[in-house]
């Protein structure tokens, strides 16, 4: 369950004048119920000391909702929220939470919005100019003194009505990221049916024309030539308006417990003890004085229980912060604690904290959260090319991450998020960045459990960085929003970094207000004020925190990342990658209509990013045409694109390990996943179909790997091969073997190195290679890393051209374009011999597992073979899916294996389709 959600403790802040006050929350639920059309569905139950009544209830209002436009609706809020109001003509909401356009798509009003240009041609573009009513009825549990409605995500303004009474107006309920807690005790009907109505007013301001509103922006993530307002204000037709995060009713007694926090001190470099400090807010909601005991209990299986308590007296309506420090309570110094580590370095162990307010030894309020014992520090070095790094538990963390995005319509889908996070772990990325687009708390909880570090912060370029256009309300909303998100994020072990801005740096009044909120809420992690090097003081002095965003945002050849002459390929970068990403053909045909598949046309551009350098897919078309040859179909073009994405993405991640810690500390790929079927940068697409970038990244992110630098230095006359170790343990006695094959499959060079030692987090030189064969226009470099006994640990296969890729001088390294002075010629791969492969598939011992064997009986190279698990011979690939490797190359008279696995709950694979580059597919049954 949630760090808070298991007992109804989602942190929040009530909007106040000036700096936002810490929220008062009834974190007293012990039974988590989900209200679904008037019925309770028990999700989690934690037994208290019988026969005491429950300390509280947390009811998610997820069912029975309806939606309608307020345009032309004569009824006011009092009428709409009254019992018996006839909403039969309204649109039934299939699932909540949901934005307006998300509901209209799910309900079939505007179906299949992501296909072709439907998002433009099939939807009225003025949905954001209308107000919208959300309405539901629910039963409120009886027997409690206080009832709160919690709205953690409303976009953008709202009136809240309950049982014919207005609870809050749109002057108070404003801000996409502000959490609103509303006391509805005087308006609710305990034990009876209640009617809730929410009138949503979408974001309407257009920056540069009539100010801003602090919602969120897709900026160049969608093409503003088609969607939104030209020149930088892109949006879908409802502007993501609606109730986009879960709504809860919280019922409790006289005392509520506010958002709790735990901070950790480690005696670094030692980690054999930990000093914990626990913070909790308590509030007396009654009109009489209350006395009790506040108890904090920390548990973890296999560890001694820690319990601390102190008496508390509260006057009527008094709220107070209670702290438990290890100086006062020695038991809060843990001996030999289980630490939370990123999954690449260890186990992400979690502890449970429960806080009870007891009266007469009976809990009357309860809060709970899960936390990790760990420390995170940001370190700023003296380097000039970006020199910010993160240290976890005293250990340097080389960040090789990617940027997560929710769905374009902000669909709430924890199962999809779980699949995305599993992909992140399967890939090997060790950080996910969220540039606003702050998803539900469930996303953070899953990251805690999986050991995936997260970086959060505000969006670039639009509302959040147009400070000169902010009015008084915007400043208030900004403070409320930050306090809400920090209160939600701070207990979570996976959250490592908060950025107060992206491309810009807040003006001093805003920056100081942000910093005060972070300090007041005991933010235990790293903070930066900008993640770029663009900001300047009035005298021209750079104002930055060691992180930069110099790109590139277009494809680069592998040698670029190792050359050492391009600034963007080193240092600490918050985003870089390829903003023109072509998915596998199976995905391409899922969103481009058949008559628009080829040649590339406006329907493709509709699904591209907005930056002029990316909107026409200019760079990736140039790359594919000049390096792999012109295409005659969309399928041919997409197949070639997988080669290009594989080699470039692999090189980006490899270089940030092989380049050494002194000059390489952070690279975050732009982006991890697709927010809709799109050509905007991603490692895997909206359909969760892994392509060339995925398996290239997976190779580049192997914790222990052998890396070839694509002859990046020495004018293509010498290449360096290195061993990188991003695993948790030092290694020694390793062996490296590198062979060069020509196009006919003959071995033209064979070199070995032995006795290689490489420490954790380090890199070691293995050997150098001379030029490849002069009589083979393309050749293969096969690099193997072996255990001391010769067992293969990993293999990397690189294809190289006699004609080199050369970006030219650093001045050519423009962020949004690929301009080279010479291009590799890979066209010989189009006519390479395609051997007849022997392919078999065998079911594994566990459900959903399949081993695919690819045997090459010929003397030629079998190049770039992809396996797909299927349910039937002609079906689409099962998705989501995991393979230990794919797009494999099988050398003469050898056999390769691919291990495939369908995640639990997925269909049973019965067939496998295998396709080599430029060849026809082979389909075999799973035995």
List the predicted regions and their residue ranges.
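Extended carbohydrate-recognition surfaces in non-catalytic/accessory domains of CAZymes
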Residues: 40-150, 224-255, 382-383, 608-640, ...
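Accessory beta-strand-rich segments of carbohydrate-active enzymes
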Residues: 43, 47, 66-72, 124-256, ...
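Carbohydrate-binding surfaces of carbohydrate-active enzymes
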Residues: 50-53, 280-285, 360, 601-886, ...
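Active-site-adjacent substrate/metal-binding segments within catalytic domains
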Residues: 101-139, 144-151, 155-162, 168-174, ...
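Extended acidic/polar, glycine-enriched regions
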Residues: 189-193, 279-382
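Short acidic/polar inter-strand loop motif in beta-rich domains
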Residues: 201-208, 358-364, 785-794, 919-923
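Low-complexity, Pro/Ser/Thr- and charge-rich linker/hinge segments at domain boundaries
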Residues: 219-236, 254-261, 374-391, 803-824
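Substrate-binding/catalytic cleft of secreted carbohydrate-active enzymes
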Residues: 431-615, 627, 640, 644, ...
């Amino acid at each position: 369950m949630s760090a808070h959600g298991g007992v109804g403790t989602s942190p929040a802040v009530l909007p106040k004048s000036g700096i936002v006050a810490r929220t008062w929350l009834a974190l007293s639920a012990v039974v988590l119920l989900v209200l679904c059309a008037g019925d309770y569905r028990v999700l989690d139950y934690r037994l208290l000391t019988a026969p005491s009544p429950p300390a509280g209830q947390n009811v998610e209002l997820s069912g029975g909702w309806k939606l309608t436009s307020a345009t032309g609706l004569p009824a006011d809020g009092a009428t709409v929220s009254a019992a018996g109001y006839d909403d039969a003509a309204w649109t039934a909401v299939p699932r909540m939470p949901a934005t307006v356009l998300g509901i209209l798509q799910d309900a079939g009003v505007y179906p299949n919005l992501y296909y072709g240009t439907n998002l433009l041609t099939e939807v009225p573009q003025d949905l954001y100019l209308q107000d919208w009513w959300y309405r539901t009825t629910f039963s409120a549990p009886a027997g409690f003194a206080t009832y709160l409605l919690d709205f953690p995500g409303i976009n953008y303004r709202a009136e809240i009505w309950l049982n014919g009474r207005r609870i809050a107006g749109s002057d108070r309920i404003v801000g996409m990221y502000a959490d609103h807690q509303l006391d509805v005790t005087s308006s609710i009907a305990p034990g009876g049916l209640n009617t809730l109505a929410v009138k949503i007013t979408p974001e309407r301001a257009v920056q540069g024309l009539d100010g801003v509103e602090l919602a969120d922006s897709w900026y160049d993530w969608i093409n503003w030539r088609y969607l939104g307002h030209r020149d930088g204000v892109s949006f879908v037709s409802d502007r993501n308006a609606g109730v986009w995060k879960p709504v809860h009713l919280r019922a409790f007694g006289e005392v509520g417990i506010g958002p709790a926090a735990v901070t950790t001190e480690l005696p670094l470099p030692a980690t054999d003890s930990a000093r914990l400090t626990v913070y909790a807010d308590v509030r007396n909601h009654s009109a009489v004085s209350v006395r009790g005991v506040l108890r904090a209990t920390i548990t973890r299986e296999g560890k001694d229980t820690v319990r601390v308590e102190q008496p508390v007296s509260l006057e009527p309506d008094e709220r107070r912060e209670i702290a438990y420090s290890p100086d006062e309570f020695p038991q809060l110094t843990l001996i030999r604690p289980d630490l939370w580590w990123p999954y690449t370095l260890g186990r992400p162990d979690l502890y449970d904290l429960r806080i009870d307010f007891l009266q007469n030894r009976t809990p009357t309020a309860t809060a709970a959260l899960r936390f990790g014992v760990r420390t995170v520090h940001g370190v700023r070095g003296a380097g000039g090319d970006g020199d910010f790094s993160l240290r976890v538990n005293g250990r340097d963390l080389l960040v090789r991450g990617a940027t997560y995005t929710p769905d374009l319509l902000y669909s709430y889908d924890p199962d999809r998020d779980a699949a995305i996070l599993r992909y992140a772990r399967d890939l090997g990325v060790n950080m996910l960045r969220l540039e606003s687009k702050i998803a539900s708390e469930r996303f953070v909880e899953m990251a805690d459990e999986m050991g995936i570090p997260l970086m959060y912060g505000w969006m670039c370029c639009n509302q959040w960085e147009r400070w000169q256009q902010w009015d008084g309300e915007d400043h208030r909303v900004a403070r409320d929003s930050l306090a809400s998100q920090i209160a939600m994020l701070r207990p979570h072990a996976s959250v490592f970094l908060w950025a107060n801005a992206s491309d810009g740096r807040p003006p001093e009044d805003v920056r100081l207000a942000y910093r005060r909120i972070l300090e007041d809420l005991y933010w235990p992690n790293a903070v930066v004020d900008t993640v770029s090097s663009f900001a300047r003081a009035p005298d021209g002095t750079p104002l930055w925190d060691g992180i930069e965003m110099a790109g590139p945002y277009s494809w680069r050849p592998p040698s670029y990342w190792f050359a050492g002459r391009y600034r963007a390929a080193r240092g600490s970068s918050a985003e870089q990658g390829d903003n023109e990403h072509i998915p596998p053909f199976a995905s391409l045909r899922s969103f481009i209509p058949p008559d628009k598949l080829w040649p590339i046309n406006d329907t493709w551009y509709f699904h591209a990013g907005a930056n002029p350098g990316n909107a026409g897919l200019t760079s990736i078309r140039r790359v594919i045409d000049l390096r792999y040859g012109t295409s005659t179909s969309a399928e041919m073009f997409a197949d070639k694109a997988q080669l290009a994405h594989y080699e470039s993405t692999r090189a980006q991640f490899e270089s940030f390990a092989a380049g050494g810690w002194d000059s390489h500390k952070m690279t975050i790929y732009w982006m991890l996943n697709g927010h809709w079927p799109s050509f905007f940068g991603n490692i895997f697409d909206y359909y969760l179909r892994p392509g060339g970038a995925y398996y290239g990244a997976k190779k580049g992110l192997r914790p222990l790997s052998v890396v070839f630098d694509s002859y990046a230095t020495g004018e293509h006359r010498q290449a360096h091969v290195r061993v990188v170790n991003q695993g948790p343990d030092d290694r020694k006695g390793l062996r490296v073997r590198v062979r060069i094959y020509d196009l006919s499959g003959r071995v033209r060079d064979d070199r070995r190195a032995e006795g290689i030692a490489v420490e954790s987090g380090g890199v070691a030189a293995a050997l150098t290679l001379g030029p490849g064969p002069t009589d083979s226009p393309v050749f293969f470099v096969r690099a193997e890393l072996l255990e001391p006994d010769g067992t293969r640990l990993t293999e990397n296969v690189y294809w190289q051209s006699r004609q080199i890729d050369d970006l030219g001088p650093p001045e050519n390294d423009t962020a949004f374009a690929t301009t080279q002075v010479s291009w590799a010629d890979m066209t010989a791969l189009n006519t390479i011999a395609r051997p007849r492969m022997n392919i078999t598939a065998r079911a594994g011992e566990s459900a959903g597992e399949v081993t695919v064997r690819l045997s090459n009986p010929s003397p030629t190279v079998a190049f770039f073979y992809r396996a797909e698990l299927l349910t039937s011979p002609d079906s689409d690939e099962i998705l989501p899916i995991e393979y230990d490797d794919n797009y494999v190359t099988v050398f003469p008279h050898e056999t390769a294996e691919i291990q495939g696995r369908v995640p639990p709950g997925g269909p049973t694979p019965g067939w496998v389709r295998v396709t080599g580059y430029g060849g026809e597919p082979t389909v075999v049954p799973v035995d």
